[in-house]
């Protein structure tokens, strides 16, 4: 359940859907496994996984939701070889060349015949709805997975007025300034990883890892006009993260010391522990968002 990535969106209008109403809305789009002829299935699943019993898990007016996607695995090469074999057989038997339309229809038949025997894979994506911040945080670095979740949530609710988080000044300008100064605004602390890009169309990209970012070698690239597009940071003693110029966060990691804050809850009651962990994570992500918005100079005015 602990988030590992953050793609950030904000609501254009206050999110005023209560837990019970949200649960009811999502229930119409509950995940069900693929049947023998389904290529993929997608829907909402228990927010807290197998041990959970609801599609929405709420605490302190913060709502955790989850979508599950199941996809049949049909290797393209397998389909290609089966199609070529069938086409060759038909063309030999009938002494003619098959038209493209016939080949396409034959390909569909092959896929249909293979589906019942195909393996499948499942993936899950969580999101945290934060009405107090008018934000929704998606635990994914994939634009496709994020959009799929938001599209299904929009379908369930009828509307979902959200836009990507944007700031008054470009994020890369702030990151570049922090690197020049040799420090990030508190409670953030720069670490030893950064990616710099030239703003020129054919400019280069320089990546530093496990290196002191205050060294002249690093700063020399700023003098040539490169800007910082990725920067590793610590948020206090609780979170390590990689902040990107599109305001997304990768490699989000809660420290062991922070997660140990719920050790007194124990593990005898798994649901109690999951609930406590969710409350702990939610409160710290709210604190992170407040600090991030302040450090980056404030949000751009939302267009209603």
UniProtKB/Swiss-Prot annotation:
One matching Pfam family: RdgC
Domain of life: Bacteria
Subcellular location: Cytoplasm, Nucleoid
GO cellular component: bacterial nucleoid; cytoplasm
InterPro entries: RdgC (IPR007476)
Alphabetized GO MF terms: double-stranded DNA binding
Keywords: Cytoplasm, DNA recombination
Main localization category: cytoplasm
GO biological process: DNA recombination; regulation of DNA recombination
HAMAP family xref list: RdgC
Family classification: Belongs to the RdgC family.
PANTHER family linked: RECOMBINATION-ASSOCIATED PROTEIN RDGC (PTHR38103:SF1)
Protein name per UniProt: Recombination-associated protein RdgC
Organism: Shewanella baltica (strain OS195)
Encoding gene per record: rdgC
């Amino acid at each position: 359940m602990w988030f590992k990535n953050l793609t950030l969106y904000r609501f254009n209008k206050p999110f005023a859907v209560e837990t019970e109403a949200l649960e009811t809305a999502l229930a119409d789009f509950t995940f069900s496994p693929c049947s023998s002829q389904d290529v993929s299935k997608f829907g909402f699943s228990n927010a807290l996984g197998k041990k959970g019993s609801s599609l929405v898990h709420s605490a302190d007016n913060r709502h955790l939701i989850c979508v599950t996607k199941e996809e049949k695995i049909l290797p393209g090469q397998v389909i290609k070889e089966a199609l070529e074999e069938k086409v060759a057989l038909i063309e030999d038997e009938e002494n003619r060349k098959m038209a493209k339309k016939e080949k396409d229809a034959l390909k569909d038949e092959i896929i249909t015949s293979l589906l019942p025997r195909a393996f499948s894979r499942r993936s899950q994506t969580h999101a945290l709805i934060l009405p107090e911040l008018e934000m929704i945080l998606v635990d994914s670095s994939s634009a496709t997975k994020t959009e799929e979740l938001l599209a299904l949530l929009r379908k369930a609710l009828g509307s979902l007025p959200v836009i990507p988080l944007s700031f008054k000044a470009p994020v890369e300008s702030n990151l570049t300034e922090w690197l020049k100064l040799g420090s990030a605004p508190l409670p953030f602390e720069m670490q030893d990883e950064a990616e710099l890009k030239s703003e020129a169309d054919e400019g280069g990209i320089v990546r530093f890892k496990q290196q002191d970012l205050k060294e002249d070698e690093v700063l020399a690239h700023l003098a040539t006009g490169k800007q910082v597009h990725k920067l590793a940071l610590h948020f206090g003693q609780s979170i390590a993260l990689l902040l990107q110029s599109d305001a997304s966060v990768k490699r989000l990691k809660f420290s062991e010391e922070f997660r140990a804050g719920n050790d007194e809850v124990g593990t005898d009651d798994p649901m109690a522990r999951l609930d406590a962990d969710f409350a702990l994570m939610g409160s710290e992500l709210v604190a992170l968002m407040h600090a991030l918005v302040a450090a980056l100079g404030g949000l751009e005015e939302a267009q209603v």
